[in-house]
C-alpha cells in the first residue's frame, strides 16, 4: 500500500535549499521510487499559520519511505535541509483505504 512523506518547513535560505539540497535529494528520491506530488511555497493557509513550504512525496509503501530516510547517502543531504530550514514537521502516513 502506498505511503506518503509529508514535510512542512520554513525555508530561511532559499538559495541553499534550491542550490544544494534539491539537486542532491532528487536522485535519492528516484533511487527509492518516490514521486513528488506537492512541492513549493505557493500555498494558502486554510487554518493556522503553516510554514512557508509544504512537500508531499509518494512511495510504494512505508518500508520504502523509511528506506529513503535511513539511506546512508541521505544523511549528509538531510544535514543540508536542517541547515537551510527551520520549524520542520515530517510525518510518514500510509495511504487511506476505506474499510481497511
Can you say where each PLM-predicted feature lies in the sequence?
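Short S/T/G/P-rich N-terminal loop/turn motif that feeds into the first structured element of a domain
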Residues: 1-53, 60-70, 94-100
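Basic side chains
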Residues: 18, 58, 78-81
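Generic beta-strand structural signal
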Residues: 53-55, 88-89
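C-terminal structural segments of small proteins and small subunits
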Residues: 66-68, 73-91
Amino acid at each position: 500500500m502506498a505511503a506518503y512523506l509529508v514535510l512542512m518547513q520554513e525555508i530561511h535560505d532559499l538559495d541553499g535549499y534550491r542550490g544544494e539540497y534539491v539537486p542532491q535529494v532528487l536522485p535519492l528520491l528516484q533511487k527509492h521510487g518516490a514521486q513528488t506530488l506537492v512541492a513549493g511555497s505557493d500555498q494558502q493557509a486554510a487554518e493556522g499559520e503553516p510554514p512557508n513550504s509544504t512537500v508531499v512525496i509518494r512511495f510504494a509503501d512505508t518500508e520504502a519511505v523509511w528506506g529513503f530516510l535511513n539511506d546512508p547517502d541521505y544523511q549528509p543531504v538531510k544535514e543540508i535541509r536542517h541547515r537551510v530550514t527551520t520549524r520542520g514537521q515530517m510525518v510518514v502516513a500510509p495511504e487511506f483505504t476505506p474499510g481497511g
